């Protein structure tokens, strides 16, 4: 027999390395086979509900790190709620219509203009489902627990039907109308766009200052006077119909030296203009208030047959330009508004693909709009109207899918009126909680300032607008027809809109006074995809009886304030008068390590699959819990290396606890709270505080606080304190001694509680740990979160032990100094003499603390503070410490230096305490003796 055979050296099959990339997938298979998600839902039947509604990601390509961050965040919340007394189902969704899928098929060689709409839509449908399967696999690999077999897809007939009914309700309320006004127009997509589909980039455009000659000065200006206007879109000059000024600004009529012409410029911009044009000795002839110039006429700079009218508008500024704005009502929202006020025609000489039409004039016809800039500038020069041309850097809208610039273009479109229900929507926002709280103001301002929603799209892969036209062109948006279409879609899918005649899509026997011959046609446009996802509160929440409407929570990227948060809010308030969610959490974007947007072309992407294969999904999940995702998040390999190191600390700590409870059965060996040793009772109370803090952080969605609290507890309270001296009990003391079982009781309670607490973040690891615990639930996901206990002496214990730990830190410092001076090697070679004041000594005595144990020294002596020698290390007014080498020899078993080593005749290398333990528990050692080293 060897001495080590008499020690209770912990053993466990729980490996130091998790081999996560391999073992996680095996565990996910086990979850699927055992239907863990379904079991959890069944357990929670009848409990209060908590519904997190999944904003649908777009079904195109593998998931990126932003997807991972978002879905893992949701999973953490849902798992926690499910283990905390809530019925919390999670239905994942996908946005499956839209331009990117059409574009992808075009890349694969399909030309939608050379095939039937029905055939092209079939290809889109098949492609979308493949993408859903691909992303579902990616999400499941991250350990996301969800209703994977019954997700919601915006292409599902039942969803499309509810979307049509949502549209119908809005039409019934008079919120749907057809109008011609400028909308974001993507020539690269050949379709109108919503604000949520637009992104902005800085671009350099040719800007021009040019003069427009007064034609009818109304007795205010003579005909040798020119308005100086400014534009950053010279290509729109062919569509110019007026000049907009501000009624309250002062405008100066000036004449520079050497010029026959007189010019009108906003007085506050005169110095700037003179500098730009190189004017000298500028003479001010007249100062006129803007309102006096109203309806004065000017001549178009390169079309003498066209008159321009001076108009008063509220959008003119003095920040740039001249205070006079070139106005083309067909190409700008403000221009359109002021043009309508003045009764101007809406002139739009650009086609769907961005090419100028014949209306623009022979020099422009067939020219791409960007190329028309140069022609317009040349014509200004030729007519001596151009005063200055310069490059201008400004923010410009782009199609977020094609990454091409877009234009404002007035076209006939279908709109959802926001204006009619704006006040209701703003009121609904007041009832919603936001995290971060600035989200409320952001969404409020967006709704306050946004225009009506253009919901029609000139594409084919989407939900058709359920609108019919009578023989005289009257649009038909009746409750009867729309609901009938919804019923047809629910039964047959929306493809029938493109396969059936209009008469077959109308209710049997339907008639309309505008179609005396019974002839009808149908709308060709489809709905904006934001109307698809924006109807999910009706298509999912209100449809599935185990969900709730409104949802308790939505959690998406901050771009969704203008996207899904926005569109779903509008439709929900329209159909039900309330917001579709009670709380909104927004997250920032994932950027590369340098703060740049991730892009395949830049080669700076890190994708979840790469980390999964290299380190495991648990590392991504732990990383998600370690970041503040309320703002933009930088992602680098170093982030995951750091998360991996933290994971190892958690795993190794758990492994130590498992190894040292392998012979512990809580039912047979557990020690009651009142019988626990002082240090163990304190650790249990402290762990109870940890449970309280972490659960509060979960409730507040404060993942980073959970991460920090957990790591600090493991490193500081367990590893550096409790487990630091634990081996002197669990290894050394008799197997069934109260001292050892007391500590094991706390070890086990910490293990069980800790495993439950980390389950939402590290479910794979938690399940692996759970297999080694003697708990009734087969899977930890089917257990409940640890409850916060009420220890009557808890607060008192925490306060007193804080003093003990401060004392310990002072002694450890003195031991460190003794090591540095070579007085001792390990702390077990030391004797510590503590000189305590009366209150501290009384505290130690009251608690019954084994100070020698927690200080990890071989010998300890406690004396009055008044006896402290001058060379003792003094800490405040309560403690002095003297470290000296311990007297005696080192016990081969407990490694303590003692004066009674060899006092037992049978065990020459053991101290008296170890000799007694061996004699009582290993009597064979007396006759056999120990093997020599």
Swiss-Prot record:
Annotated motif 'KMSKS' region: location in the chain? Answer: 597-601
Q: Where in the cell is it found?
A: Cytoplasm
Task: Give the disulfide map.
Answer: none
Q: List the protein's name.
A: Isoleucine--tRNA ligase
Gene name, please?
ileS
Q: Name one GO molecular function term.
A: aminoacyl-tRNA deacylase activity
Cofactor descriptive note: Binds 1 zinc ion per subunit.
Supply the domain comment: IleRS has two distinct active sites: one for aminoacylation and one for editing. The misactivated valine is translocated from the active site to the editing site, which sterically excludes the correctly activated isoleucine. The single editing site contains two valyl binding pockets, one specific for each substrate (Val-AMP or Val-tRNA(Ile)).
């Amino acid at each position: 027999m060897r001495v080590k055979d008499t020690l209770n050296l912990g053993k466990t099959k729980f490996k130091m390395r998790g081999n996560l990339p391999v073992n996680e997938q095996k565990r996910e298979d086990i979850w699927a086979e055992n239907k863990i998600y379904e079991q959890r839902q069944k357990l929670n039947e009848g409990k209060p509900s908590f519904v997190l509604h999944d904003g649908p990601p777009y079904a195109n390509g593998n998931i990126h790190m932003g997807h991972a961050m978002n879905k893992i965040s949701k999973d953490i919340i849902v798992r926690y709620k499910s283990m905390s007394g809530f019925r919390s189902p999670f239905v994942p969704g996908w946005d499956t219509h839209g331009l990117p899928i059409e574009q992808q098929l075009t890349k694969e060689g399909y030309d939608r203009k050379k095939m039937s709409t029905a055939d092209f839509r079939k290809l889109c449908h098949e492609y979308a489902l493949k993408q859903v399967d691909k992303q579902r696999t990616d999400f499941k690999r991250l350990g996301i627990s969800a209703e994977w077999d019954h997700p919601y897809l915006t292409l599902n007939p039942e969803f499309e039907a509810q979307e049509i009914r949502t549209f119908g309700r809005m039409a019934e309320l008079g919120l749907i109308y057809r109008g011609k006004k400028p909308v974001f127009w993507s020539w690269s997509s050949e379709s109108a766009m919503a604000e949520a589909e637009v992104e902005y980039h800085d671009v350099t455009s040719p800007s021009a200052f040019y003069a427009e000659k007064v034609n009818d000065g109304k007795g205010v200006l003579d005909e040798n006077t020119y308005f100086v206007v400014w534009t950053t879109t010279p290509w729109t000059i062919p569509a110019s119909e007026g000049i907009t000024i501000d009624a309250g600004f002062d405008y100066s009529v000036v004449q520079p030296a050497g010029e026959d012409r007189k010019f009108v410029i906003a007085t506050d911009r005169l110095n700037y203009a003179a500098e730009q044009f190189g004017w000298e000795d500028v003479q001010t002839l007249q100062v006129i208030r803007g309102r006096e110039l109203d309806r004065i006429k000017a001549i178009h700079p390169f079309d003498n047959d066209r008159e321009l009218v001076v108009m008063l508008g509220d959008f003119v500024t003095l920040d740039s330009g001249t205070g006079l704005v070139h106005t083309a009502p067909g190409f700008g929202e403000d221009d359109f508004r002021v043009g309508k006020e003045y009764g101007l025609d809406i002139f739009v000489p650009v086609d769907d693909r961005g090419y100028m039409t014949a209306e623009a004039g022979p020099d422009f016809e067939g020219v791409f709009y960007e190329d028309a800039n140069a022609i317009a500038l040349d014509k200004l020069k030729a007519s001596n109207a151009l005063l200055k041309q310069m490059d201008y850097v400004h923010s410009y809208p782009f199609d977020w899918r094609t990454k091409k610039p877009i234009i404002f273009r007035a076209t006939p479109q279908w709109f959802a009126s926001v204006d009619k229900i704006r006040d209701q929507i703003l009121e609904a926002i007041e009832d919603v909680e936001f995290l971060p709280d600035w989200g409320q103001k952001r969404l409020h301002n967006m709704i306050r300032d946004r225009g009506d929603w253009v919901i029609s799209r000139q594409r084919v892969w989407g939900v058709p607008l359920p609108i019919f036209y009578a023989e005289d062109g009257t649009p038909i948006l009746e409750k009867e027809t729309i609901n009938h279409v919804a019923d047809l879609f629910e039964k047959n899918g929306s493809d029938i809109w493109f396969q059936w005649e209009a008469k077959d899509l109308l209710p049997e026997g339907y008639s309309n006074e505008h179609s005396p011959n019974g002839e009808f046609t149908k709308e060709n446009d489809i709905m904006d995809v934001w109307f698809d996802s924006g109807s999910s509160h009706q298509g999912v929440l209100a449809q599935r009886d185990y969900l709730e409407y409104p949802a308790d929570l939505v959690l998406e990227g901050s771009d969704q304030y203008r996207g899904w948060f926005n569109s779903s809010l509008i439709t929900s308030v329209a159909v039900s008068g309330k917001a579709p969610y009670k709380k909104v959490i927004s997250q920032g974007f994932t950027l590369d390590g340098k703060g740049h947007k991730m892009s395949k072309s830049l080669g700076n992407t890190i994708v979840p699959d790469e980390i999964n294969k290299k380190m495991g999904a648990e590392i991504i999940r732990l990383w998600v819990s370690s970041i503040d995702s309320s703002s933009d998040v930088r992602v680098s390999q170093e982030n995951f290396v750091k998360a991996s190191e933290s994971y190892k600390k958690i795993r190794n700590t758990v492994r130590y606890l498992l190894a040292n409870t392998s012979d512990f059965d809580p039912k047979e060996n557990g020690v009651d709270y009142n019988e626990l040793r002082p240090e163990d009772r304190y650790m249990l109370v402290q762990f109870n505080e940890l449970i309280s803090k972490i659960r509060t952080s979960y409730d507040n969605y404060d993942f980073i606080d959970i991460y920090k609290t957990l790591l600090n507890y493991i490193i500081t309270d367990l590893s550096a304190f409790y487990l630091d001296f634990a081996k002197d009990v669990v290894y050394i003391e008799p197997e069934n001694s109260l001292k050892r079982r007391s500590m094991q009781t706390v070890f086990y309670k910490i293990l069980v509680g800790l495993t439950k607490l980390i389950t939402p973040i590290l479910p794979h690891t938690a399940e692996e740990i759970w297999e080694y615990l003697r708990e009734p639930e087969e899977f930890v996901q089917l257990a409940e979160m640890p409850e916060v206990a009420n220890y009557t002496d808890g607060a008192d214990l925490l306060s007193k032990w804080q003093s003990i730990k401060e004392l310990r830190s002072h002694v450890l410092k003195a031991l460190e100094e003794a090591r540095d001076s070579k007085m001792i090697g390990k702390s077990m070679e030391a004797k510590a003499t503590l000189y305590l004041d009366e209150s501290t000594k009384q505290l130690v005595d009251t608690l019954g603390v084994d100070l020698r144990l927690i200080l990890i020294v071989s010998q300890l002596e406690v004396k009055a503070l008044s006896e402290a020698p001058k060379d003792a290390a003094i800490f405040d007014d309560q403690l002095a410490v003297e470290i000296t080498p311990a007297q005696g020899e080192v016990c081969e078993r407990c490694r303590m230096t003692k004066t009674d080593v060899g006092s037992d005749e049978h065990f020459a290398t053991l101290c008296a305490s170890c000799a007694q333990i061996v004699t009582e528990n290993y009597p064979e050692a007396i006759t056999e003796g120990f093997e020599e080293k």
